[in-house]
């Protein structure tokens, strides 16, 4: 009787063991599949966000595959960040810089700033902020078109004094009841243009005779 019981217990143990292995394997495959889908969704979201900044037809490469690692405190970074180089016919056409405005009303404002190779602004988008709903959040494109007022601007258009909100005798509108937020964004975008102008050849990978 005991040998029969032992064989039965062993058989049950083997069955349970195989079931457990199969279950673990299935869970692992499911987790791997889920992680793959999440990664793909995140990549697609990044592609869409970057594509909003540059006009269609201004580049023909995959932006996420052309990253430039930056260590740039001038752009408000405390750690290395990724910029994205746009190419057209294998020539640099624009660069998207990650920029942080540290002096928003409620904290840091995180931006993406697209700059054409000739130094004109292609576009600016807000990645994240904690500004006051109904006031400072008008920096979001979903809330107003204010962020589009940067498009086509450059270091020389407007001039140095013009890179400020109108309350500070500059060219850019502020919001009713909220001046600090747009002031911080204008300052950060202007800083991004200065950084690009200073490091243009290095950022775009140009030889000296192409500068």
Swiss-Prot record:
The chain crosses the membrane at residues 13-33. The keyword Transferase does not apply. One of its GO terms (cellular component) is plasma membrane. Its EC number is 7.-.-.-. The keyword Chaperone does not apply. It is a single-pass membrane protein. It comes from the Bacteria. GO terms for molecular function: electron transfer activity; FMN binding. Its cofactor is FMN. Belongs to the RnfG family. The complex is composed of six subunits: RnfA, RnfB, RnfC, RnfD, RnfE and RnfG. PANTHER family: ION-TRANSLOCATING OXIDOREDUCTASE COMPLEX SUBUNIT G. Part of a membrane-bound complex that couples electron transfer with translocation of ions across the membrane. This is Ion-translocating oxidoreductase complex subunit G. It comes from Ectopseudomonas mendocina (strain ymp).
């Amino acid at each position: 009787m005991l040998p029969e019981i032992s064989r039965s217990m062993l058989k049950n143990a083997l069955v349970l063991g195989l079931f457990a292995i199969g279950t673990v394997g299935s869970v692992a495959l499911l987790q791997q599949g889920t992680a793959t889908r999440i990664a793909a969704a995140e990549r697609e979201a990044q592609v869409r966000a970057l594509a909003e900044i540059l006009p269609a037809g201004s580049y023909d490469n995959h932006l996420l595959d052309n990253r430039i690692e930056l260590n740039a405190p001038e752009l408000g970074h405390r750690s290395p960040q990724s910029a994205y180089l746009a190419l057209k016919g294998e020539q640099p056409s624009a660069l998207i810089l990650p920029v942080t405005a540290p002096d928003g009303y409620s904290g840091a404002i995180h931006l993406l700033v697209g700059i054409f190779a000739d130094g004109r602004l292609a576009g600016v988008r807000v990645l994240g902020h904690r500004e006051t709903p109904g006031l400072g959040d008008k920096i979001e494109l979903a809330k107003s078109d204010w962020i589009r007022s940067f498009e086509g601007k450059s270091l020389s258009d407007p001039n140095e004094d013009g890179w400020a909100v109108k309350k500070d005798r500059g060219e850019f509108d502020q919001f009713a009841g909220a001046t600090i937020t747009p002031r911080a964004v204008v300052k950060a975008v202007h800083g991004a243009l200065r950084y690009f102008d200073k490091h243009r050849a290095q950022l775009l990978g140009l030889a000296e005779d192409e500068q």
